[in-house]
Amino acid sequence: ENRCAEDKRKLKGGCSHLCLPNRLSRRCACPIGLTLLDDQKTCTTVPDKLLILARKKDIRIKQLDSRNSKEVDNNIPLDNLKSTMALDWCSKTDRIYWSDVGKSTINRAYLNGSNQETVVQDGLVSPAGLALDWVTNKLYWTDAGTYRIEVASIDGTQRALLIWQNLHKPRDIVVNPMQGYMFFSDWRSEPVIESAGMDGSKRKSIVSENLYYPTGITIDY
């Protein structure tokens, strides 16, 4: 007996996504990032409450609202990761973007690992910081090897240099596209966190005391 046979709605085993047969029956399951609803047949249509983390040679995802307390985080199936560093996610397109300092590239893929591609690779050395502007669909990044902050469209085109003067080892970067500001850290001899317009203008220091290695920063919108 085929417990995952298609029904009248063309659903295998009555499951909206994955049907997993077992010895006595079958179990419905969901792709990475989606949650099985109470009917035990239907998956949510969009991911919700996710934690996405980079661990050098893999990128993992965990559902924070999972009904299964024993569920572990899942490895997103990506190829040839060498040293992933910065990571961001676009909820509109369901794509993740990450920098790989081992390969000196900026890459993207869908949350299920499909359509993996490199979007920026020329002229990069150590792209340690990455931020997605979801309003105008731009990528901002820092490069501690070229001492630059740059921007490009999310497909890597229309690339532009924003800040290069008086940068020693720019590290992390976050953006606030609603207000038109970006914030970044710099591991200079006297470390600093600065702000600037998203076009690189109006640059100023906002934190310059009691800093050592300001690796990660975030913003409260």
Residue ranges and their predicted role:
Residues 87-89, 130-132, 173, 217:
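Hydrophobic core register within WD40 beta-propeller blades
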Residues 10, 75-80, 119-123, 162-166, ...:
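Surface loop/turn motifs at the tips and blade-to-blade linkers of beta-strand repeat domains
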